[in-house]
């Protein structure tokens, strides 16, 4: 089933309602990180260039639903967009019963979470939003995994529902990485807990040629291999699960390699002293915070031979430089690789920024939870809705 793309539509004189992910950090009324806003600009500019009357909506933060709270107002986003687009951008506070918007104009709706029923995908609210437009554009990959009124319900009732360029790019990149990858396909999954990424690990272990685990997740696999992990964060109740995942990968000719050397310390602190040890020499008082140089080189070799790389999560506590060498080496290997690479998730993007490899990664996903759910093999509610409307 084909999804309609906004770029293929004639929008001249049309009222176009775009759902973007403009959920950005704001401090004292000023946007402090504009990555999501920058990512949304080409879609808004394209709608204007196509002669549309443009309405934009998003959530911002986690206000109490149905209650106005100035702390979560879209005003700072409106100010940013007015500068970035070099045109007048208005904030509409009461818009559900109709809003005046002219061709060539941009109106941003106040925080959609100020509307009661937004998160429950309320039908009446969805229909009111749909009545405001001729064309609804879903462009917020970061919220595509949530079935809410502004991301899902509105699209069921709008005259036309389509994917914006940003969402289309995300789906193309993820499809290229997972549905039809150039092999070998290597996935790097980091993070603190196996439990939060278990479904991802299960899904990926069935399709990748090599699965690399890092961070606290790796500690559980180290313990499963029979090594002492000392006071490290790990999940004893998931050791059998880790063994099963390794066996599953090996049965397909792949593997989930366990680090041979690790970087440990006696405490979790920015000033903790880092000590390099063989994985078999970890003491009861040690905490593992990174992989060692031998392990990092072995993983770099796996990455260098890859045809496709999916990266979600650092392999160490890279926020502290003494525990960042493993993640830095992985980042460098991805940057040097000729493979198609996709990176996603907040910590991963922070590592991409820290090690300056953004322009060397083929595609950087804007979605956190949505990226993970896609890796889990789930169909995202927004995508299901767009397929239904495109049929």
Curated annotation (Swiss-Prot):
Positions that bind ATP: 197, 319, 345-348
Highest taxon above the source species: Bacteria
Key words, A-Z: ATP-binding, Cytoplasm, Glycolysis, Kinase, Nucleotide-binding, Transferase
Pfam families, alphabetized: PGK
EC number, as in UniProt: 2.7.2.3
GO CC terms, sorted: cytosol
Keyword Magnesium set for record: no
Key word Transferase present: yes
Biological-process GO terms, alphabetical: gluconeogenesis; glycolytic process
PANTHER family with a match to the protein in the record: PHOSPHOGLYCERATE KINASE (PTHR11406), PHOSPHOGLYCERATE KINASE 1, CHLOROPLASTIC-RELATED (PTHR11406:SF23)
Protein name in UniProt: Phosphoglycerate kinase
Organism: Shewanella sp. (strain W3-18-1)
């Amino acid at each position: 089933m084909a999804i309609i793309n906004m770029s293929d539509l004639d929008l001249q004189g049309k009222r176009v309602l775009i759902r973007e992910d403009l959920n950005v950090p704001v401090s004292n009324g000023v946007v402090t990180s504009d990555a999501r806003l920058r990512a949304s600009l080409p879609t808004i500019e394209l709608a204007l260039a196509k002669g549309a009357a443009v309405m934009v909506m998003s959530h911002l933060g986690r206000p109490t639903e149905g209650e106005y709270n100035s702390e979560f107002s879209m005003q700072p986003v409106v100010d940013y967009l007015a500068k970035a687009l070099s045109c007048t951008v208005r904030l509409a506070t009461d818009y559900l019963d109709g809003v005046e918007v002219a061709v060539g104009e941009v109106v941003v709706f106040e925080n959609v979470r100020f509307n009661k029923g937004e998160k429950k995908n309320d039908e009446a609210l969805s229909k009111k939003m749909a009545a405001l437009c001729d064309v609804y554009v879903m462009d917020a990959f970061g919220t595509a995994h949530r079935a809410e009124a502004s991301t899902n319900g509105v699209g069921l009732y709008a005259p036309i529902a389509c994917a914006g360029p940003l969402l289309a790019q995300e789906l193309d990149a993820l499809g290229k990485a997972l549905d039809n990858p150039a092999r070998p396909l290597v996935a790097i999954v980091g993070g603190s807990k196996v439990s939060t990424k278990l479904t991802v690990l299960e899904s990926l272990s069935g399709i990748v040629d090599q699965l690399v685990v890092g961070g606290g997740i790796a500690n559980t696999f180290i313990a499963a291999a029979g090594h002492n992990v000392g006071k490290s964060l790990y999940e004893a109740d998931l050791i059998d699960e880790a063994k099963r995942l390794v066996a599953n990968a090996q049965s397909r000719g792949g593997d989930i390699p366990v680090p041979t050397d690790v970087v440990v310390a006696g405490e979790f602190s920015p000033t903790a002293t880092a000590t390099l040890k063989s994985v078999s020499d970890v003491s009861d008082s040690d905490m593992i915070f990174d992989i060692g140089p031998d392990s990092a080189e072995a993983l770099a070799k796996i990455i260098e031979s890859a045809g496709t790389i999916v990266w979600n999560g650092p392999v160490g506590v890279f926020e502290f430089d003494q525990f960042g060498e493993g993640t830095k080496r992985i980042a460098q290997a991805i940057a040097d690789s000729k493979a198609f690479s996709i990176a996603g998730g907040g910590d991963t993007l922070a590592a991409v920024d820290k090690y300056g490899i953004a322009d060397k990664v083929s595609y950087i996903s804007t979605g956190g939870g949505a990226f993970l759910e896609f890796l889990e093999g789930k169909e995202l509610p927004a995508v299901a809705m767009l397929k239904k409307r495109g049929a």
